[in-house]
């Protein structure tokens, strides 16, 4: 987007020459080593395992193992959801199976963890969590080198501006705050995607469009699909800009139309290559509770307003949820990673270097686009008119738009690259009247931070005010902590932010008063740009003692030696899998609506209910049955919930069959086997099943509820037993005295196929959410095989796209050889 002839001074060390490129890599590695060094060398684990050591979570609380100090209460998903999912994927892959179906939650659901992600597949090479830090380093290298090549090829800046931006991009707040979450993985491909779009539209490389296909596929499969959609949305906006700039006034001519078609073809092939991931995910999402809520217009993260704007340059303005701090941001912000602070790219990059991009006229057209992209990324958080209604349109409202902030960060760094280029090769910097604008802004921010370090916010001015604030925001004053420690944290961080603002003011004054000549303080400026980000990043991600990594719980291990059955209670859903147990609850970001509806009918009144994870902490109604039993709602009997886990010490009148420190487990003797034959089958009109299931008189052994007519005797008799199973294949041996309905208490999903003695059979939705098959009298084998049509179609589409892509590459290769031949003849 800039003049490519500006690189003459830097070409001797940059580009593809190895010494220069190794310097790029070394800077990226050094930044990650500073942040995650203990985990990279194996002394720590890059997971917030201290969360597991909190009271009532997972690790037993005993006198020998007191409650650990909590680093941050927010990144619970890393240990509650994503690490159990990774371990399940590791288990399946190491047994030679691909992880399509997750039986450890909700009675079984499609496994939607981004299993095709190259980053997550690398994490699955070993069971050890030590791989997590190394994959984080690889991801940083991917996005950092992408930023380098984008700056060099698309922005046409020199080696050093591109290198500094490559060092900075993996350190920006979005990546740091979302470290470890699959949420951010698609964003690591953002520079490569923008570069592929730029090269395709400008037609500067024959492999650009095929490369766009590959990078589009990698973006779609690497992380969460909504963030991948936002990355592609940003690339679409950039494509329109590049197209408009490449074909000024000739947008309808043949060349312009061909260029646009090539971009669309590149994106289209990328979507087809990602079809095995996309199609099953979208199919499952249609059944999801959270999806239905978003379709209805319910917003989990509504816009904040202009009060969020200062966080872009003062990210710790409202504190954090980390230890010895408090998050006092205005409603509706609840934590730092979902706030505008995720756009932080460094106050020096934003207010010292980026404004210099406007110094030379040749940069200004491109700068207008980057300013627009930065505003677009902030639009949801700032509740900007015009943007927010657009982002609330169908399809777009399925995304969490507060996460568009990575576009703001990328745009600021693009402006920073232009600003650094101005300093290095743009000639002497002469005074401009507008230099005082960022200078005054930085001075104002500095003064405000110093003022706040003396006059603290009202919410933390006294212990009483702090307790009252915590009670309003979190409904609990017990976790508020000592206000003096919180005050010290705010004073320290306000002072640090003021110091960096002072550095920015000094930088502008230096440019105002400097003598004409070459800018000689570039190394110092580069140091401060990186240091600015490192001081924000350092210590944000918890790195914990390996001893905290899901230690064995004897009471839970003992369950595995007894009759199989699902569990409930004791700790957040999914953690049971780390002990080899399957929980009927779950949490997977989609949540199957029918299973959620059924489980909610069993919830005790004080049971915790999170709108985004309605069964995550669900505690069921029930009663203790001395000496060792427990009674549960009939629905849980139907769902094979055999073991109920409690914490602490049992009452004197109970003698649990399984007990260890802080854990005791009771057996629900009324739990049905996972496969059974109900005595009768009752047909109901659609919509009446939940009412019947919620009745205390419902007996799942006596009656099964269906919504379609079946021809069966008044009373069905037979015995069934599961003889063999893996997550995607279940074999049941049946001896039926009469025709009957074999019920499998697993979640119904359209991807399953049933075969009775090898003959395909229809699968009925039974009892609102589980599955059943009508079989004739006699002895036979019923097999359930998970073979979703969406996966089969996705594999065919991906194969077709791969063939087209390979053919395309072959044509490019042949044309390249044909073009070389005449040149060789002429040379000869």
Predicted ranges, named:
Residues 30, 147-156, 197, 201, ...:
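Transmembrane-helix signature of membrane-embedded glycosylation machinery that interfaces
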Residues 39-154, 160-189, 307-340, 754:
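Active-site lumenal/periplasmic loops and adjacent helix-entry segments of GT-C-fold
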Residues 1-3, 8, 21, 164-166, ...:
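Contiguous transmembrane helix-bundle modules in multi-pass membrane proteins
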Residues 574, 585, 642, 651-652, ...:
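Active-site-proximal, structured, solvent-exposed surfaces of multi-pass membrane proteins
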Residues 52-79, 83-87, 91, 97, ...:
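Periplasmic/ER-lumenal interhelical loops and adjacent helix-loop junctions
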Residues 16-107, 282-289, 538-541, 545-550, ...:
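Hydrophobic alpha-helical membrane-insertion signals
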Residues 127-155, 341-361, 497-511, 791-816:
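Selective detector of the "anchor" transmembrane alpha-helix that sits immediately C-terminal
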Residues 54-55, 59-60, 293-302, 486-494, ...:
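Extracytoplasmic
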């Amino acid at each position: 987007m800039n003049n490519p002839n500006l690189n003459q001074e830097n070409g001797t060390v940059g580009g593809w020459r190895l010494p220069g490129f190794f310097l790029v890599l070394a800077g990226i590695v050094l930044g990650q080593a500073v942040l995650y060094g203990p985990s990279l060398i194996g002394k720590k684990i890059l997971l917030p395992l201290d969360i597991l050591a909190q009271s009532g979570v997972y690790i037993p609380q005993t006198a020998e193992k007191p409650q650990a100090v909590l680093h941050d209460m927010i990144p619970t998903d890393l240990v509650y959801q994503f690490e159990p999912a990774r371990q399940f994927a590791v288990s399946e892959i190491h047994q030679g199976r691909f992880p399509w179906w997750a039986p450890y939650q909700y009675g079984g659901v499609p496994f939607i963890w981004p299993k095709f992600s190259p980053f997550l597949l690398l994490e699955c090479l070993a069971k050890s969590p030590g791989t997590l830090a190394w994959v984080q380093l690889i991801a940083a290298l991917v996005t950092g080198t992408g930023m380098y090549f984008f700056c060099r090829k698309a922005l046409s800046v020199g080696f050093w501006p591109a290198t500094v931006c490559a060092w900075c991009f993996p350190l920006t707040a979005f990546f740091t705050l979302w470290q470890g979450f699959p949420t951010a993985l698609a964003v690591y491909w953002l520079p490569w995607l923008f570069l592929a779009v730029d090269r395709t539209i400008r037609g500067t490389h024959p492999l650009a469009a095929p490369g766009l296909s590959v990078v589009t596929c990698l973006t779609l499969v690497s992380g969460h699909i909504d963030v991948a959609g936002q990355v592609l949305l940003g690339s679409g906006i950039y494509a329109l800009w590049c197209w408009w700039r490449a074909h000024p006034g000739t947008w309808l001519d043949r060349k312009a139309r061909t260029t646009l078609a090539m971009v669309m073809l590149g994106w289209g092939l990328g979507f087809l290559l990602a079809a095995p991931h996309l199609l099953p995910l979208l199919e499952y999402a249609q059944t999801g509770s959270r999806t239905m809520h978003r379709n209805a217009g319910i917003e989990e993260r509504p816009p904040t307003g202009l009060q969020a704007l200062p966080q872009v340059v003062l990210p710790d303005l409202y504190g954090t949820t980390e230890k010895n701090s408090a998050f006092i941001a205005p409603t509706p912000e609840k934590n730092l990673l979902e706030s505008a602070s995720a756009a932080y790219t460094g106050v020096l990059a934003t207010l010292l270097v980026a404004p210099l991009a406007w110094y030379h006229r040749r940069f200004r057209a491109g700068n207008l686009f980057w300013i627009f992209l930065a505003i677009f990324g902030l639009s949801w958080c700032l509740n900007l008119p015009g943007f927010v209604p657009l982002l609330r349109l169908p399809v777009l409202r399925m995304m969490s738009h507060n996460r568009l902030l990575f576009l703001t960060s990328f745009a600021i760094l693009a402006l920073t690259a232009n600003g650094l280029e101005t300093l290095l090769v743009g000639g002497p910097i002469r005074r401009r009247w507008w230099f005082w604008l960022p200078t005054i802004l930085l001075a104002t921010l500095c003064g405000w931070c110093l003022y706040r370090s003396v006059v603290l916010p009202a919410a933390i001015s006294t212990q009483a005010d702090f307790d009252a604030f915590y009670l309003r925001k979190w409904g609990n004053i017990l976790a508020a902590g000592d206000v003096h420690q919180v005050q010290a944290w705010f004073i320290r961080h306000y002072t640090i932010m003021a110091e960096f603002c002072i550095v920015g003011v000094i930088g502008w004054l230096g440019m105002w008063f400097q003598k004409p000549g070459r800018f000689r303080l570039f190394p110092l400026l580069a140091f401060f740009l990186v240091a600015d980000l490192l001081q924000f990043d350092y210590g944000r991600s918890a790195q914990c003692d390996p001893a905290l990594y899901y230690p064995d719980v004897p009471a839970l291990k003992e369950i595995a030696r007894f009759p199989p059955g699902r569990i409930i209670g004791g700790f957040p859903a999914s953690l049971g899998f780390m002990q080899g147990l399957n929980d009927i609850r779950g949490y997977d970001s989609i949540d199957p609506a029918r299973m959620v509806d059924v489980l909610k009918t069993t919830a005790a009144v004080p049971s915790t209910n999170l709108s985004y994870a309605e069964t995550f902490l669900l505690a069921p109604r029930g009663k203790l049955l001395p000496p060792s039993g427990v009674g549960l709602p009939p629905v849980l009997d139907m769902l094979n919930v055999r073991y109920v886990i409690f914490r602490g010490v049992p009452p004197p009148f109970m003698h649990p069959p399984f007990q260890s420190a802080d854990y005791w487990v009771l057996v629900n003797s009324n739990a049905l086997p996972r496969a059974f034959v109900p005595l009768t089958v009752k047909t109901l009109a659609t919509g009446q099943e939940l009412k019947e299931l919620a009745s205390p008189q419902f007996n799942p052994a006596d009656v099964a509820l269906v919504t379609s007519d079946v021809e069966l005797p008044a009373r069905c008799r037979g015995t069934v037993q599961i003889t063999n199973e893996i997550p995607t294949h279940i074999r049941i041996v049946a001896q039926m005295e009469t025709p009957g309905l074999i019920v499998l208490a697993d979640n119904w999903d359209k991807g399953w196929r049933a075969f009775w003695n090898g003959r395909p059979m229809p699968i009925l939705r039974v009892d609102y959410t589980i599955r059943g098959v009508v079989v004739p009298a006699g002895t036979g084998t019923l097999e359930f095989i998970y073979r979703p049509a969406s996966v089969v179609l996705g594999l065919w589409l991906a194969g077709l796209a791969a063939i087209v892509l390979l053919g395309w590459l072959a044509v490019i290769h042949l044309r390249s050889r044909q073009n070389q031949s005449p040149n060789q003849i002429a040379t000869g």
